[in-house]
């Protein structure tokens, strides 16, 4: 994409977020204010979206300590996501999964130069407050951790730090954007090493986008879609006009090989999150480098082939067959 269309696209997104912010302010003036609202600095939409845009064609890797974060940085990752446990271990351990220790997050921030992100539980406003307080670059309101609110997500407009949220289909993505998310990722099924669910979710999202674009001149159709999704009509119109999800959208959930990463980019992802696929493998350093290469050069089959040769299937993480999981064991159904 050349610089002029990219700037025009970014300005459209900025204007949309400003309109949503104005609507929020009108509601506040009318008295619709959360009684426990904590005053926070509000980052401008342009700053939030501009930072996220710089991550395109990159890989954000899940890490649990400084050593893994340094491996990610050396491999060329555009960022790391700090967790207490990798998604595979979260799934195996059971119990309640919470935000990582703030001390560990700060140690990672001190040790590397690339952006540092961390996960909070869905609906846990104050975990997000703490992450913003210590200065993380991106907050992931994640279904991988145990939700504290099954009905409501965090009001992300109250934060200056950008948020990323997961989605399985377009309505879910647009609801999160309307709440202030600056970035969307496919949910997939984290911790399985099986990319099938991420593929299904990305196809569902962009199949719906194409349908909206085909009806972009049909006001009644767009209005009905907005009503069904429970989102502002403006966000639906913006999606239809742009022909894509209005914010940067990464693939996530089960990516374990360079080929997986390249495939998700081919489906329309702007970049990828890799969770357990790297550090639950037997060749994390080489695999991290290979996935970064395949993501950056996904449209060059020769480069992707070279990346795939860097890893061995025998060293890949032991995957989990999603069909063997019980409905209550699925992480993707949390927080819709």
Swiss-Prot record:
Keyword terms of this UniProt record: Lyase, Pyridoxal phosphate, Schiff base
Active site, per annotation: 119
Alphabetical list of PROSITE patterns matching this protein: PDXS_SNZ_2
Pfam families per UniProt: SOR_SNZ
Pathway: Cofactor biosynthesis; pyridoxal 5'-phosphate biosynthesis
Residues that hold D-ribose 5-phosphate according to the record: 62, 191, 254, 275-276
Catalysed reaction equations from the record: aldehydo-D-ribose 5-phosphate + D-glyceraldehyde 3-phosphate + L-glutamine = pyridoxal 5'-phosphate + L-glutamate + phosphate + 3 H2O + H(+)
GO biological process: amino acid metabolic process; pyridoxal phosphate biosynthetic process; pyridoxine biosynthetic process
Positions of D-glyceraldehyde 3-phosphate binding: 203
EC number: 4.3.3.6
Membrane-spanning parts: none
GO MF annotation: an example: pyridoxal 5'-phosphate synthase (glutamine hydrolysing) activity
Assembly information from the UniProt record: In the presence of PdxT, forms a dodecamer of heterodimers.
Family: Belongs to the PdxS/SNZ family.
PANTHER family referenced in this protein's UniProt entry, alphabetically: PYRIDOXAL 5'-PHOSPHATE SYNTHASE SUBUNIT SNZ1-RELATED (PTHR31829:SF0)
Main function: Catalyzes the formation of pyridoxal 5'-phosphate from ribose 5-phosphate (RBP), glyceraldehyde 3-phosphate (G3P) and ammonia. The ammonia is provided by the PdxT subunit. Can also use ribulose 5-phosphate and dihydroxyacetone phosphate as substrates, resulting from enzyme-catalyzed isomerization of RBP and G3P, respectively.
NCBIfam families associated with the record: PRK04180.1
Stored HAMAP family: PdxS
Protein name: Pyridoxal 5'-phosphate synthase subunit PdxS
Gene behind this protein: pdxS
């Amino acid at each position: 994409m050349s610089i002029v269309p990219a700037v025009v696209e970014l300005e459209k997104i900025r204007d949309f977020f400003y309109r949503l912010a104005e609507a929020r302010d009108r509601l506040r003036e009318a008295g619709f204010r959360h009684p426990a609202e904590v005053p926070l600095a509000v980052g401008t939409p342009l700053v939030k979206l501009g930072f996220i845009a710089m991550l395109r064609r990159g890989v954000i890797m899940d890490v649990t300590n400084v050593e893994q974060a340094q491996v990610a940085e050396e491999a060329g990752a555009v960022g790391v996501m700090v967790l207490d446990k990798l998604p595979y271990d979260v799934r195996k351990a059971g119990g309640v999964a919470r935000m990582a220790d703030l001390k560990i997050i700060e140690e990672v921030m001190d040790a590397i130069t690339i952006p540092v992100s961390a996960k909070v539980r869905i609906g846990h406003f104050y975990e997000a407050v703490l992450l913003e307080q210590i200065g993380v670059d991106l907050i992931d309101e994640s279904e991988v951790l145990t939700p504290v609110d099954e009905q409501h997500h965090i009001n992300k407009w109250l934060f200056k730090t950008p948020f990323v949220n997961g989605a399985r289909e377009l309505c879910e993505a647009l609801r999160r954007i309307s709440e202030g998310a600056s970035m969307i990722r496919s949910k997939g099924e984290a911790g399985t090493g099986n990319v099938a669910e991420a593929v299904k979710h990305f196809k569902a999202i962009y199949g719906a986008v194409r349908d909206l674009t085909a009806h972009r001149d049909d006001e009644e159709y767009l209005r009905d879609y907005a009503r069904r999704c429970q989102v502002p009509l403006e966000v639906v119109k913006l999606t239809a006009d742009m022909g894509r999800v209005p914010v940067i959208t990464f693939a996530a959930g089960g990516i374990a090989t360079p080929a997986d990463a390249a495939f998700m980019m081919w489906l329309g992802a702007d970049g990828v999150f890799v969770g357990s696929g790297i550090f639950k493998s037997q060749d994390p350093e080489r695999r991290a480098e290979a996935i970064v290469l395949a993501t950056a050069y996904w449209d060059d089959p020769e480069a992707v082939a070279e990346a795939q040769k860097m890893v061995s299937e025998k060293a890949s993480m032991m995957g989990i067959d999603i069909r063997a999981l019980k409905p209550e064991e699925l992480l993707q159904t949390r927080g819709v």
